[in-house]
């Protein structure tokens, strides 16, 4: 909103397999959105969004169908439901499991980018023999700062705001933007390619 004053932001939702659905945000800037519309049905099973569409593709070439016997597609998006509105929490493949406690990277990313001197951030899980996974944050800075100061500042800012297991165990300062060639935010194994 700061970069484009006067612009109304609205979420949209679509998948290659079913197309783009009509969407309505609860209010400007809200993360809660109502999706579906004519030709689309949605349901939530175990906090996962399932979609059925008249416009759905037939399937993948030489691969099993992504649809169940009734034509429903598991999107693998984890959502919360509030009346007719849903809020996307993340993908089930992004869940980080720290000693049995689960978190979505987006929660930690949103806190990190709200901090001073943090231009951008990504968060991922990294395998750990003791905890299963640990939280790893990669940040881009606005201005140069020592790694020691950044780590101390981030941990201090997050302490008390989130549970201890959500605080990044490793913090990496990246020299380049964290987007791939398709301008999507890099995650998981993509992050191994980011120069630090």
What are the roles of these predicted feature ranges?
Residues 1-29, 41:
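Gly/Ser/Thr-rich phosphate-binding loop
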Residues 7, 40, 118-119, 169:
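A structural micro-motif
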Residues 35-39, 43-70, 101-103:
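Conserved ATP/PPi-binding loop(s) of AMP-dependent carboxylate-activating enzymes
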Residues 160-184:
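AMP-binding/adenylate-forming catalytic domain of the ANL superfamily
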Residues 184-196:
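Phosphopantetheine-dependent thiolation modules in NRPS/PKS and related acyl-activating systems
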């Amino acid at each position: 909103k700061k970069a484009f004053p006067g612009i109304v932001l609205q979420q949209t939702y679509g998948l290659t397999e079913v197309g783009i659905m009509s969407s309505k945000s609860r209010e400007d800037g809200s993360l809660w959105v109502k999706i579906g519309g004519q030709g689309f049905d949605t349901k939530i099973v175990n906090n996962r969004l399932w979609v059925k569409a008249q416009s759905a593709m037939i399937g993948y070439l030489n691969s099993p169908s992504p649809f169940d016997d009734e034509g429903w597609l598991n999107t693998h998006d984890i959502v919360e439901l509030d009346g007719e509105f849903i809020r996307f929490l993340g993908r089930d493949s992004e869940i980080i499991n720290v000693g049995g406690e689960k978190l979505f990277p987006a929660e930690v990313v949103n806190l990190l980018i709200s901090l001073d001197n943090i231009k951008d951030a990504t968060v991922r899980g990294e395998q750990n023999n003791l905890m299963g996974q640990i939280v790893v944050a990669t940040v881009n800075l606005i201005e140069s700062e020592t790694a020691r100061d950044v780590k101390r500042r981030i941990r201090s800012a997050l302490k008390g705001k989130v549970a201890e297991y959500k605080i990044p165990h490793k913090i990496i300062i990246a020299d380049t933007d964290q987007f791939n060639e398709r301008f999507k935010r890099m995650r998981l194994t993509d992050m191994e390619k980011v120069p630090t």
